[in-house]
Curated annotation (Swiss-Prot):
Superkingdom of the source species: Bacteria
Coiled-coil zones: none
This protein's name: Type III pantothenate kinase
Source organism phylogeny: Bacteria, Bacillati, Actinomycetota, Actinomycetes, Kitasatosporales
Originating organism: Streptomyces griseus subsp. griseus (strain JCM 4626 / CBS 651.72 / NBRC 13350 / KCC S-0626 / ISP 5235)
GO terms for cellular component: cytoplasm
Length: 265
């Protein structure tokens, strides 16, 4: 099986693929202080819970694909693959890795690996033109041309960042639970804040996507808009522009990049 690891700023998502099918997944907190040994222990605990894998670290794993937005974690995971997975082929997404998607940016090396991986999956699953909206620590909007090229995007503060900022900077406000309010017009402070977050972000998505579509394609209706990320469900029901929801888009992209970089016997 293929182990895929997507390290974000807040959470790390892991997925196990049996062929093209994702058969297991986990979400854990990202901690830049974890060493390679600590990560190995964590992986062994997760892997040991799966009935198709052995209790020893590496049993049943035939390949590994990793992307990370936290450089220190990527370094430690590199050590994990080297020390604990032996001869198992590993692909770490960094400059030089074949993705199959041209990156039309001023400095391609500065684009987050997860954003490129999302574009890879979007091209494979839906074709271009497309826009990927990833609801993570930041909310990112990434554009794929009709020819399957990554052409750039938008980075905005994420939902959790906005909630925390309201609680920290607002003298009479506090951190709230992320939940849909009963109505747009809040009847108390918590509901009013929840409404601002949910409907404010839905409006942001609709507005940004509408502008991106005009730049991306002659006919905006040709553009497929894909939502992904852990916080996507908060906005899905309120946005009018999202066509597809694929929660495992990044993991699928990692599988595709692994296959394009590891030759099969």
């Amino acid at each position: 099986m293929l182990l895929t690891i997507d390290v974000g700023n807040t959470h790390t998502v892991l997925g196990l693929f049996d062929g093209e099918e994702i058969v297991e997944h986990w979400r854990i907190s990202t901690d830049a202080r974890r060493t390679a040994d600590e990560l190995a222990v964590l992986l062994q605990g997760l892997m040991g819970m799966h009935p198709l894998l052995g209790m020893e670290l590496g049993d049943g794993i035939e390949g590994i694909a990793i992307c990370a937005t936290v450089p220190s974690v990527l370094h430690e995971l590199r050590e994990v693959t080297r020390r604990y997975y032996g001869d198992v082929p590993a692909v770490l997404v960094e400059p030089g890795v074949k993705t199959g998607v041209p990156i039309l940016m001023d400095n391609p090396k500065e684009v987050g690996a997860d954003r490129i991986i999302n574009a890879v999956a979007a091209v494979e699953l839906y074709g271009g033109p497309a826009i990927v909206v990833d609801f993570g620590t930041a909310t990112t909007f990434d554009a794929v041309s009709p020819r399957g090229e990554y052409t750039g995007g938008v980075i905005a503060p994420g939902i959790e960042i906005s909630v925390e900022a309201l609680g920290v900077k607002g003298a009479q406000l506090r951190k709230i639970e992320l939940a849909r309010p009963r109505s747009v017009i809040g009847k108390n402070t918590v509901e009013a804040m929840q409404s601002g977050i949910v409907y404010g972000f839905a409006g942001q998505v609709d507005g940004v996507v509408a502008r991106m579509k005009k730049e991306l394609a002659a006919d905006p209706d040709d553009v497929t808009v894909i939502a992904t990320g852990g916080l996507a469900p908060m906005v899905l029901g309120e946005s009018s522009v999202i066509d597809e929801h694929e929660p495992w888009l990044t993991l699928i992209g990692l599988r595709l990049v692994y296959e394009r970089n590891v030759s099969r016997a």
